[in-house]
Amino acid sequence: MIEKRPISNLIGHLMLIIGIIIVVFPIYYTFVASSMSSVEIIRPPMPLVPGTRLAENYSEALSGGVERVVGVSLERLLFNTFVVAIAIAVGKIVISFLSAFAIVFFRFPLRMAFFWMIFITLMLPVEVRILPTYKVIVDLGLIDTYAGLTLPLMASATATFLFRQFFLTIPGELVEAARIDNAGPFRFMRDILLPLSKTNIAALFVILFIYGWTQYLWPLLVTNDSRMNTIIIGLRKMVDFTDASTPWNYVMVTAILAIIPPVAVVVLMQRWFVKGLVETEK
């Protein structure tokens, strides 16, 4: 029987409320700012209640306001970012799943050496890898293309490692039963591994989608054409060094719209995400 401790419960709830405020307040503040004019935003103190320009700001931003500032429409920025995030998430999962499948279930020379080569890349800083990768993309003529934005970010040593660890927990009897049933590698992967891995895949998809959605450095390097910019690059271009020349109302509108897709993915896949993390820990 769990002993009830009112003081402990009170402290726990208080810490939870403080944490929620710390996380939610900046988002609320951004939403309030998106309902005001630029002059109202930069004039301190800014009110904490929504202004009167909410519908007007969003309508203007979506109907050409952002395009006049950065040279590309807000819809295009969102579309580019969505394509990049989906391609990176799906690409990482597919490549990592197949890599881990080959390492665990196939017997070939130097297979563990290949695994450690993949694993060692976790220790390499991004700065070490980014310049050689950029040179390859330039030589292949993939600047200002979706392939250039996504292909170099699809390989994932972390996801490969997680899939490998999960595959190692699969009982040998299950593998042996598949062999007795004359199940080939593709059938074994399709009928056994994929159903068992669906929660892990869902958890990884959420994490990798957010990773792809928030990319800044790589899109900054490989996009010169504003039509290929992502939402994060668009936000950076909107912000000038002087407050007076920055369209803060459009910046706040864009920031709110940039938050919605990742939040929607987390909310819609929350049950699978939590279940996948718990099963990964096991």
From Swiss-Prot:
GO cellular component, one term: plasma membrane
Subunit structure: The complex is composed of two ATP-binding proteins (UgpC), two transmembrane proteins (UgpA and UgpE) and a solute-binding protein (UgpB).
Coiled-coil stretches noted in the UniProt entry, renumbered to this chain: none
Organism: Rhizobium meliloti (strain 1021)
InterPro entries per record: MetI-like, MetI-like_sf
SUPFAM superfamilies referenced in this protein's UniProt entry, alphabetically: MetI-like
ABC transmembrane type-1 domain mapped to chain residues: 78-269
Record keyword Ubl conjugation present: no
NCBIfam families xref list: PRK10973.1
Protein name: sn-glycerol-3-phosphate transport system permease protein UgpE
Annotated disulfide bonds: none
Transmembrane parts of this sequence: 14-34, 86-106, 112-132, 136-156, 201-221, 248-268
